[in-house]
Amino acid sequence: MDMEALKQKIEGLDIPQSLKDELFEKLSKEKDLTEEMVDEIIDEVVNAYRKALVEPYEAVGIVAAQSIGEPGTQMSLPYEEKIIIKEGEFIKPVEIGKLVDEMIERFGFEKIGNSEVCDLPIDIYALSLDQDEKVHWKRIISCIRHKHNGKLIKIKTKSGREITATPYHSFVIRKDNKIIPVKGSELKIGDRIPVVKHIPANCVEAINISDYVSGNYVVDNINNKIAPKINGKSIPNNIKLDYDFGYFIGIYLAEGSVTKYFVSISNVDELILNKIRAFADKLGLNYGEYDNNNGFAESHDIRIYSSTLAEFLSNFGTSSNTKKIAEFVFGANKEFVRGLIRGYFDGDGNVNADRKVIRVTSNSKELIDGIAILLARFNIFSIKTKTKNQFVLIIPHRYAKKFHEEINFSVEKKKSELERLVSSLNDDKTYDSIDMIPSIGDALTKLGEKVDYPKVILKKFERKQKIGRATLQRHLRRIEELAVKKGVNILALKEYWLLKKAVESDVIWDEIVKIEEISCDKKYVYDISVEGLETFTTFDGVLTHNTMRTFHYAGVAEINVTLGLPRMIEIVDARKEPSTPIMTIYLKEEYKDNREKAEEIAKEIESLTLGSIAESISIDLWTQSIKVELDENRLADRGLTIDDVIEAIKKKLKVKIDVDGTTLYLKIKTPSIKALRKRIPKIKNIQLKGIPGIERVLVKKEGGEYVLYTQGSNLREVFKIDGVDTTRTITNNIIEIQEVLGIEAARNAIINEMRNTLEQQGLEVDIRHLMLVADIMTADGEVKPIGRHGVAGEKGSVLARAAFEETVKHLYAAAERGDVDKLKGVIENVIVGKPIYLGTGCVELTIDREYEEGKNMEE
């Protein structure tokens, strides 16, 4: 068996490193194993490990580990989930897996835990939601992937949007008029998640046809022409993205098909046919016309003869099942997009004033998804449904007026029906079951009180904690009118701006109607890290969140805690540092009842690094430096200035720092991409404030007082913080307790930690057993492990030492030294089959049987 090949095979497994080391050690000693047997053993080990993985709070015998709020490792999307990005001036949907894999292949990655993280040195942007409930293009800081062997959850909303993610992927919800993250596993039917209804765009004005066809063409840049190499007519290469071009593509999406040599469009409306003829004439192309009876209805075909145009249009799909929106369209000129949507609706759309609906159908889901995104360019929201054979896009009547103003129809019959629908709408009827704004708190009620607005009207919205956008807009309008009459300056009121922000938001808070578990058949799952609020948008328009990186003292984030057998092993091994060090910090009387004071202490304790205070840290290729963009709000929140940050950087690194507003440029002597990338992790970890080793602090109210929970431990430094109750504050790091509080405190900590661990698994063990273990571990004045390097290795009996671990080694060493085992203990006597030296086993008296028998005879 090739040891190097075996090591590589084991290193590629998705299991802990300690398990990999143990597996390699044991397999390398077995010389008679075939490759097939080795593979079988490896599969068994991996399967056993996966079965041992448990959900939070789930206990499996004594082996139960609680993994709560694991940041950045399990919060991911599957390969095929598309997200919307902007690269240069082009907006496009891309599979997240394809994007991340390409970036890692191109720029490499850093292994952080189980994740492969690639910090992007180039500018790619994601559509992101901010606290102002507006969407903006924000830079993607890094791409992330990691292996996943569990289930995925698929979420469907009332408007027909869908997203698939890992259960621990982070979404955002609206709570008390703020945007906050929440794990997917915590979402439930009835919750509302944001779906984009407006997309800001760059507006690409023109494209080169040569960028979208194969290499079998000749480009004449002087005359702006492109033509096939062998025969065929030329067309303009650089073509303006105007309304007419957009309309032609829209009609093609609805009614067109292509062959290798021509484009065919079928329709009977003379207005549409004239537009097609005009477009062909504009390009100088020949066309033919044919009456067509396809078995369903009479039609009329126009065939435009151009292999160049035909190949270009294949970017939009070639059949009804494969039609789609080409990538360049999403960032195209608004007039071009307007023309495309009108052309498509003229062909396939319909409107019914009586049913108050505008709709379009297609055999292609990808096309319907693309049209929905394009409608968002005009602030028009749509609903997706599916019939037995087709995908349907519905524009609610609330957006009919907007559709009439921005898009409209060219076909007279459809145009007049749309006008009839718009004129029939009643502005007073504002109920909308989809566009509801959740979790408004008491802001509307408080605002109404300021102008004596009838409380009974507003109280029901506070009770239900949701209100339709149009309804809220109507009430705000009336409150504004009352404020003018009563001389109240509502512009100075916080509640007014909170509600105004909700009304003018760029998202619909879409209700979840279905959540289901599905299998994951891919090796990796993926994520991206985005500047600001860390949100990005999927191709279905769902805004999602990548991590819980920001401060959450209200219990949004949680702490990792090792429980069960792994924790028991840590205790008896007397580990210098637990795998998940935590502290429970109690506060003094004047602090424990005041949340604000508790949060101040939390901020004083929590370690603040440059990575957590910066909007982004990236390589600036133009200046050959590391660019650090600081967040003024975060700096102010933690009581820091830019000068404080600069001073901290200079203490750790020898770099030249240029300052441009809130952006720092860190320059090294010999810059290169490799050298700059190597320094980024060090820069991210520069300590600015707080106690080293304490990564996060949570504030929770328990038993009538506020208690701090930390991820990380530093007992000595925490005791120095004013306001901390040192008589009750504890850590799960037993060695730290010994160093700070002494051996007696460490003994008590061992007992308490073991008892708590066992109780959490529902196991009852007499405390005297735990006390005995603690006494043995601390008897010599320092905490010693139960193992060959501690208590067990110090046993006087050779056989007792050999029975614990490394049998051959102990017996060989004892024989070499000539050790004698007096068989005084329990273990060694059991091994050799002798009575235990205990109780009657201690008696060494002998009896003279003959004497006893003779004595009895005399009597």
UniProtKB/Swiss-Prot annotation:
A GO MF label: DNA binding
Class in the EC hierarchy, top level: transferase
PROSITE patterns per record: INTEIN_C_TER (PS50818), INTEIN_ENDONUCLEASE (PS50819), INTEIN_N_TER (PS50817)
Keyword Chloroplast tagged: no
GO BP terms: DNA-templated transcription; intein-mediated protein splicing; intron homing
Compartments, record wording: Cytoplasm
Main location: cytoplasm
Catalytic activity: RNA(n) + a ribonucleoside 5'-triphosphate = RNA(n+1) + diphosphate
Keyword terms of this UniProt record: Autocatalytic cleavage, Cytoplasm, DNA-binding, DNA-directed RNA polymerase, Endonuclease, Hydrolase, Intron homing, Nuclease, Nucleotidyltransferase, Protein splicing, Transcription, Transferase
Enzyme Commission designation: 2.7.7.6
Post-translational modification comment from the UniProt entry: This protein undergoes a protein self splicing that involves a post-translational excision of the intervening region (intein) followed by peptide ligation.
Pfam family, one: LAGLIDADG_3
GO cellular component, as recorded: cytoplasm; DNA-directed RNA polymerase complex
HAMAP family: RNApol_arch_Rpo1C
Function: DNA-dependent RNA polymerase (RNAP) catalyzes the transcription of DNA into RNA using the four ribonucleoside triphosphates as substrates. Forms part of the jaw domain.
Subunit annotation: Part of the RNA polymerase complex.
Family the UniProt entry places it in: Belongs to the RNA polymerase beta' chain family.
Name recorded for this polypeptide: DNA-directed RNA polymerase subunit Rpo1C
Taxon lineage: Archaea, Methanobacteriati, Methanobacteriota, Methanomada group, Methanococci
